[in-house]
Amino acid sequence: MQFERTFSLVTKMRICVLGGAGHIGSGVVRALVKRAPDAEVVIADKNLEEAEELVAELGGKISTQSVDANDSKSLIKVMKDVDIAIGAIGPYYTYGVKVLKAAIDAKTNFVDIDDDYDATKACLALHEGAKKAGITAIIGLGATPGLTNILAKYGSEKLDKVDEIHTAWAWTAMDPFMGPAIIAHYFHASTGDVPTYRDGKWVEISALSEPEVVDFPPPLSGIEVYNVGHPEPVTIPRYIKGVKVVTNKGTVWPSLMTEASKIFAKLGLISLKEFTIKGVTMPVRDVAVQFVMSIPDLTPAETISALATEAEERYGEYALEGVGLKVKVKGESQRKTTCYSYGVACRSAVVCTALPAALGALMVAAGKVKEKGVFAPEGVIDSKSFLKEIAKDIEVLETEEKAGKL
């Protein structure tokens, strides 16, 4: 896909990145420094030591501020005096609504990378409150959801009629810097019944059901993915009218981690059901997350080495930090059945997630998005302008298939 790379962004602004010292949040800060070098960036995080290390590394107009995501007054305080805030504190089923409510109370424009379907529903329900506060809030603007949604919109705008939109992703589980929120999200998406959109209505289906091999761009290529709980089927039908089917399927690599997740889900070990161990009560999912975080210390070195070798042989330089995305938009154009496919293979899942959030925030702060309220990305972002900017750092491959006249 060839995009004209001419989109001017105003860079003299003040931006707060909540969770800006974290795995994804630090990527957002880096993207802002690269794309808007004159902007003032505030890293709001509970871990000020790591925040200061990031400031020392990047320099520029970056400052730090302590924030407690469980304290609404603390959240409001750091968001009060900025042009826009970016939420990178997860998991979003815990923090999505809390942080968005604080942004509304602070009357500050807002973008986040909310990737949990239930949090997405709850945040969209705050639309009128955000509208009354006079702010623009865009939720779920990462890689998936986010870039997937914008690609779905872009493809849909090229069709006369849209019938089906299929989104998929494959993510590394080998990144040594991956935080607990990402693991908790994957477990959340992989358990119980999750929403999808079929025959023009929302229905519940089993997570990790209906395996399908999706052909991502090389070197990722064919990877088996499964139904997961994600925002795309929740939001896309709200904005792309007439679509009858919207799906999201995903997985992680190496394959052993996918198989382990299936077993955990079947045994109920990644649910939010609470249990007590040695007098301490907690959701069983918290234990599973800590277990996964401890794999490097618990698993024999030869097993870790074998998994790394397997992934490197299969995915090459994408093995450790990569991600793959695929979007298919099916419908009708000039009375012909047409399918547009978009594929992304990115060496860095952090970049692929952080860059869309940074660009979206810059667009809102620069006045490129006028609507007030809470929206998913496809609801308010101009797909062509956005993808022109994405193309500077992330390659998107487009294919078109046409059948005979109807």
Language-model region placement:
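Conserved glycine-rich Rossmann-like NAD(P)H-binding loop of the short-chain dehydrogenase/reductase
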Residues: 37-47
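Helix N-cap at the beta1-alpha1 junction of Rossmann-like dinucleotide-binding domains, i.e.
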Residues: 47-49, 117
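Rossmann-fold NAD(P)-binding glycine/threonine-rich loop
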Residues: 114-135
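Conserved Rossmann-fold cofactor-binding substructure of NAD(P)-dependent oxidoreductases
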Residues: 67-82, 88-91
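ADP-ribose/adenylate-binding Rossmann-like module
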Residues: 91, 102-120
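C-terminal catalytic/substrate-binding lobe primarily of soluble NAD(P)-dependent oxidoreductases
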Residues: 158-406
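N-terminal Rossmann NAD(P)H-binding glycine-rich loop of SDR-like oxidoreductase domains
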Residues: 16-31
